[in-house]
């Protein structure tokens, strides 16, 4: 039941305690008091006989020393060589964390730190557990932001050729990569730094085009003319993942009327031509009105024909919007008739600004009743739903806006060359007003898409682009995603919803810094030439020369005569190379094809921020499922964003931007920005709830530093008490240990198990909480406080001392390994200060926590926790006074609790028993019945303790009494316990130890 450690049960009643011998008072206590100077002299007399802790490991490192200490530790411990070492060792299992490539366009920031450190904690944990870790860092190197930044550094950039632009962009990306790489290494990130991947590497680009090739062959890639998100500021199409939304965008909304040309047949009796009649429409994008081709209604909704009190004309709008619209227009509506949306069929209107154009009334399911009038102006070139309606009804999709966001000549002289979001909008509103169609204009604040890089407003614009037909791969992707473990689970539905909304993916971009779409166009007809053979030919060239070849080589070397002939052409020179490049999400989304090894090419983990649910996670899934019908990952771990410590977005104007380099090395003014070192940054990451937004600032960093200093104090105590101890030769078997030492091993085993499980679940904040609780509650506050006497005052090689030293050695090893993935610098620093030669290879080359299952002893908690409950009662009864100045009597009724305490103290009274050590008293007496006489100055406390053994099969509640009274003994000048007969003479134990030292 309790294990072999427990003494045989003895339920006899002890003889009554000799009251006179213990409670005799005399004047001994007064005589024992000494002057401080005299006490100091006598203490110093025995100082050299006490085994005080000693270690060169600092309890706290001054901030100025922290960065250099970490760099020295990295060098001594071989941080840079660790990755290649673990790749070369024999390991049964492989663990692959595929690095989502950060964008190579700037300095490292705390978002990078959060992401890279989380990955490193994950990798180091798995490596220590015996896995062969595969982690190849990479960078996303193409795209508009890099191109624009590179060009901003060049005078006359507008005159550069595509080849020159590409060269400048590549050089810029390379510089950014070197900066970021140096920072990541400084943070202690373990990775294959010698073989990083970059999306501009020829082999990467070739593998990317191979994925494109397979998707094209399977029919997933096509060209079409339809509306896409368009960035006028960047002059290119963008995917939805490249948008960010401005919640405070101000649009110019208008209420306008479309005069009825043909009344819907079912409303002929109501709208008979006796009064002017129009449909009432609301839009936040007046500039799209010239492209209007129809007005849409919701078939199942109710609509009203109303008479306007101001003008007397008839207006049609949704019945649910009559009251609110009348209020906005500052008029009154008289409802003449109500009908269903389907009753509006076969009606048509006059275009409000273009004479002679007819806009039919058409049904559509995207019409909503929450705002506007329930009738939607439909411009197929500027809306996804509008385009679908137009396709269904064979309406034209004419785009009157050019790539820079200006009206084209086809829009008419009044609008030509005007910016649609600025003066173009104003011009259209004036045209509506001139035509008598404008009823109301007002500012409208709403969420609006912006280009994520230029930070300028987007528009939706029809253009000829290349697409991935995600509608055909979506169902398979959703099924594949259901087999993926996603942490936290709250991200599952969000990713599925984002995937469900995506019907197509625009993959073409009108820039030159990227991977070209391998397509050729007939000069005269514009007809595209692309097939399996032409793509394969381009891939061969790209693999050898890189994608620069697309711009530098003549078309004759890129397109074969055979391919032209097969397509029905006659001359290669009749064709031109396409000028579009692939979306950078397609670049990074095919990284699995280049980086992941083995036949399966599947990573164990992708770990990125929540913005990647619609970005890299999704693009990787779509490309992998389209070509292989499986996800490229087994687990997704999704973390939040970094914010200022008050929860606000970081901004230079606010002054709350945290620079990781300043965190580590300090700023110009160390009083304002002190150096913390990389481990503080790593602790901040680990202790945060990374599945929500992660806060950082001076208060957070100071708290992290203080937490590490507390941990250092705990480590220093253990290191300091290891002097002269060699675990290989001096360890005591658990069966021969003090029960409290066995109890600590039991707690160590439990701690190791819980920490391991927390790491497995990527719950690193739980690891930190477990670590702090174990070090503070179990070690510092409990175990260290009761074993100091054994450590300092017993003979150096006494088994009792060796017993707790054995536990300290095991605890140090378990604790250091448990936080090593989080604080690798501190972990290696501790191992470098071990006073014995143990694991000279360091922490990371010697495995994970080795907590023996033999340490687990169910039931042992009851003995120690029962004793601790009584100690708490005892300490509470003396109100913060020194427990060493008291003797304690514990009275327990016969039963399990009494048996457990007997295992800790076989004698009736003892100053050296295990129970007395826990009580921290001068002497402990254990009785099974209350003494007949109790001194008046005794403190008596009663309590109960519930014993729960064998998983609850054995339960017994026992009552106890704790009687505390001042001791009559003097303070020993050596051990400072009240166990001596005279304040000038050491206690019997200390005399024996001193005598032993003299004999040696």
UniProtKB/Swiss-Prot annotation:
Pfam families: Anticodon_1, tRNA-synt_1. Coiled coil: none annotated. GO terms for biological process: isoleucyl-tRNA aminoacylation; mitochondrial translation. The gene is IARS2. Disulfide bonds: none annotated. It catalyses: tRNA(Ile) + L-isoleucine + ATP = L-isoleucyl-tRNA(Ile) + AMP + diphosphate. A motif ('HIGH' region) lies at residues 102-112. It comes from the Eukaryota. This is Isoleucine--tRNA ligase, mitochondrial. NCBIfam families: ileS. Belongs to the class-I aminoacyl-tRNA synthetase family.
């Amino acid at each position: 039941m309790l294990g072999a450690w427990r003494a045989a049960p003895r339920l006899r009643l002890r003889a009554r305690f000799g009251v006179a011998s213990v409670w005799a008072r005399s004047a001994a206590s007064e005589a024992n008091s000494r002057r401080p100077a005299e006490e100091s002299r006598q203490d110093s007399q025995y100082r050299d006989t006490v085994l005080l802790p000693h270690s060169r490991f600092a309890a706290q490192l001054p901030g100025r020393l922290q960065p250099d200490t970490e760099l020295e530790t990295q060098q001594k411990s071989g941080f840079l060589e660790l990755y290649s070492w673990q790749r070369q060792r024999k390991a049964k299992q492989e663990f692959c964390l595929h690095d989502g490539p950060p964008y190579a366009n700037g300095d490292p920031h705390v978002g990078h730190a959060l992401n890279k450190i989380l990955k490193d904690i994950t990798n180091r944990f798995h490596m220590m557990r015996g896995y062969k870790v595969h982690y190849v860092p990479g960078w996303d190197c193409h795209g508009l932001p890099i191109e624009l930044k590179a060009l901003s550094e060049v005078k006359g950039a507008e005159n550069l050729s595509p080849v020159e632009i590409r060269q400048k962009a590549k050089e810029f990306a390379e510089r950014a990569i070197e900066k970021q790489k140096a920072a990541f290494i400084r943070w202690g990130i373990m990775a294959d730094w010698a073989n990083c991947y970059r999306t501009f590497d020829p082999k990467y680009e070739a593998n990317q085009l191979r994925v494109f090739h397979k998707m094209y062959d399977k029919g997933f890639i096509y060209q079409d003319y339809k509306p896409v998100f368009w960035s006028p500021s960047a002059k290119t199409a963008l995917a939805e993942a490249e948008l960010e939304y401005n919640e405070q965008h101000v649009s110019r909304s208008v209420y306008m009327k479309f005069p009825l040309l043909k009344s819907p047949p079912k409303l002929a009796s109501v709208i008979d031509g006796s009064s002017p009649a129009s449909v009432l429409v609301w839009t936040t994008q007046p500039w799209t009105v010239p492209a209007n081709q129809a007005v849409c209604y919701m078939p199942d909704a109710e609509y009203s024909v109303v008479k306007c009190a101001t003008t007397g004309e008839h207006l049609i709008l949704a019945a649910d919007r009559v009251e609110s619209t009348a209020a906005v227009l500052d008029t009154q509506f008289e409802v003449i008739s109500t009908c269903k949306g389907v009753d509006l069929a076969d009606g048509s209107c006059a275009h409000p600004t273009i004479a002679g154009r007819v806009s039919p009334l058409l049904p559509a399911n995207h019409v909503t009743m929450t705002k506007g009038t329930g009738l939607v102006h439909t411009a197929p070139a500027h809306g996804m739903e509008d385009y679908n309606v137009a396709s269904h009804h064979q309406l034209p999709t004419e785009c009157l806006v050019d790539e820079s966001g200006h009206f084209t000549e086809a829009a008419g002289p009044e609008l030509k060359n005007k910016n649609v979001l600025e003066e173009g909008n104003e011009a259209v509103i004036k045209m509506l007003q001139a035509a008598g169609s404008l009823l109301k204009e007002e500012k409208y604040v709403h969420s609006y898409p912006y280009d994520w890089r230029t930070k300028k407003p987007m528009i939706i614009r029809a253009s000829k682009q290349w697409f991935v037909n995600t509608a055909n791969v979506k169902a398979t992707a959703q099924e594949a995603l259901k087999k993926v473990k996603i942490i936290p689970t709250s991200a599952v539905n969000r990713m599925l919803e984002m995937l469900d909304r995506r019907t197509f993916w625009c993959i073409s971009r009108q820039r030159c810094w990227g991977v070209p779409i391998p397509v050729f166009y007939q000069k005269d007809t514009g007809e595209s030439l692309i097939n399996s053979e032409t793509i394969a030919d381009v891939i061969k060239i790209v693999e050898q020369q890189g994608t620069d070849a697309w711009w530098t080589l003549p078309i004759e070397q890129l397109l074969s005569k055979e391919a032209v002939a097969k397509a029905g052409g006659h001359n290669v020179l009749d064709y031109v190379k396409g000028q579009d490049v692939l979306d950078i999400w397609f670049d990074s989304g095919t990284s699995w094809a280049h980086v992941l090894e083995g036949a399966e090419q599947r990573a164990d983990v992708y770990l990125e921020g929540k913005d990647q649910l619609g970005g890299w996670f999704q693009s990787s899934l779509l490309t992998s499922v389209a070509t292989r019908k499986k996800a490229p990952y087994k687990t997704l771990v999704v973390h939040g964003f970094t914010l200022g410590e008050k929860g606000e977005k970081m901004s230079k104007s606010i002054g709350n931007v945290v620079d990781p380099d300043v965190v580590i090395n300090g700023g110009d003014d160390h009083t304002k920005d002190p150096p913390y070192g990389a481990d503080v940054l790593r602790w901040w990451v680990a202790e945060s709830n990374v599945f929500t937004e992660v806060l950082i600032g001076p208060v957070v960093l100071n708290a992290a530093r203080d937490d590490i200093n507390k941990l250092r104090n705990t480590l220093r105590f253990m290191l300091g008490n290891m002097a002269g101890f060699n675990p290989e030769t001096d360890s005591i078997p658990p069966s021969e240990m003090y029960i409290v030492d066995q109890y600590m091993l039991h707690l160590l085993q439990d701690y190791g198990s819980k920490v391991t499980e927390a790491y497995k679940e990527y719950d690193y904040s739980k690891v930190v909480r477990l670590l702090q609780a174990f070090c503070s509650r179990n070690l510092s506050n409990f175990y260290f406080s009761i074993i100091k006497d054994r450590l300092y005052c017993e003979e150096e090689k006494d088994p009792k001392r060796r017993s707790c030293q054995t536990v300290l050695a095991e605890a140090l090893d378990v604790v250091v390994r448990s936080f090593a993935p989080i604080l690798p610098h501190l972990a290696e620093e501790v191992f470098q200060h071990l006073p014995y030669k143990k694991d000279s290879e360091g922490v990371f080359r010697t495995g994970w926590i080795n907590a023996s299952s033999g340490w687990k002893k169910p039931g042992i908690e009851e003995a120690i926790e029962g004793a601790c409950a009584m100690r708490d009662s005892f300490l509470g009864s003396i109100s913060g006074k020194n427990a060493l100045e008291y003797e304690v009597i514990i009275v327990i009724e016969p039963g399990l609790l009494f048996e457990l305490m007997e295992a800790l103290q076989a004698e009736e009274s003892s100053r050296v028993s295990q129970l007395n050590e826990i009580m921290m008293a001068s002497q402990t007496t254990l009785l099974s019945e209350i003494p007949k006489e109790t001194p008046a100055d005794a403190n008596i406390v009663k309590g109960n303790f519930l014993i729960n053994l064998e998983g609850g099969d054995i339960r017994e509640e026992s009552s106890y009494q704790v009687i505390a009274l001042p001791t009559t003994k003097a303070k020993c000048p050596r051990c400072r316990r009240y166990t001596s007969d005279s304040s000038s003479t050491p206690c019997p134990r200390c005399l024996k130890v001193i005598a032993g030292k003299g004999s040696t």
